[in-house]
Design a protein with these regions (language model features):
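Conserved core of the PLP fold type I
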Residues: 21-161, 176-192
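N-terminal "arm"/small-domain region of PLP-dependent enzymes with the aminotransferase-like
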Residues: 1-27, 124, 133, 167
Length: 192
């Protein structure tokens, strides 16, 4: 861990000063995110990769953990789930809490309605495409906790699987800022 860089400290000082004045205090932001932030995300994160979104398609939230849980509220409770293994625990926990994970199998510690896709040194920590239809697949790349990334052709296999099977991919790109290889997509929207 390193100390905060000067640019961050300067920005935080500026924000504190804004919050200290009656005329510049903002309180809670808009539920979808500030317009200036949404425009900056479109301009700096997606447009350089040739991905075009309108402001109404960008949602700024408080993070993947709550989004992962909340999106499950609009999905059917009997949907099957696929996760890479190992996995960010919230992907499983949120499905357990809403009843989608099925029954816990005591012998294995795994849930009956979850397909676990092993990521091991034998497969270079890249899961095999399932040989059955799964309703919802969670993918996190760069992966937490393995650090593995997928190339565009590897991610395209998942997109093709999803299109062929009417599968929803919940793609968590929380660590995309660490990607330096131009053959590794920062977003699933880079896949044609």
């Amino acid at each position: 861990t390193q100390p905060l860089p000067p640019a961050c400290i300067e920005a935080m000082h500026k924000a504190v000063e804004e919050l200290a004045g009656k005329d510049t205090f903002r309180g809670y932001g808009p539920e979808q995110g500030y317009d200036f932030l949404i425009e900056a995300i479109i301009k700096n994160d997606f447009a350089p990769r040739g991905i075009h979104f309108s402001a109404s398609e960008i949602f700024v939230s408080d993070g993947a953990k709550s989004d992962t849980g909340n999106i499950g509220d609009i999905l059917r409770h009997d949907n099957s789930v696929g996760v890479t293994d190992p996995i960010y625990p919230v992907y499983i926990d949120s499905n357990v809490m809403c009843g989608r994970a099925g029954v816990l199998e005591e012998e294995t510690g795994k849930w009956s309605n979850v397909t676990y896709m092993p990521c091991t040194s034998e497969n270079n920590f890249i899961p095999e495409i399932p040989d059955k239809r799964i309703d919802i697949v969670y993918l996190c790349y760069p992966n937490n906790p393995t650090g593995t990334t997928l190339t565009k052709p590897e991610l395209k296999k998942w997109v093709d699987y999803a299109l062929a099977n009417d599968t929803l991919i919940l793609f968590d790109a929380a660590y995309e800022a660490y990607i330096q290889d131009e053959n590794v997509p920062h977003s699933i929207y880079e896949i044609k």
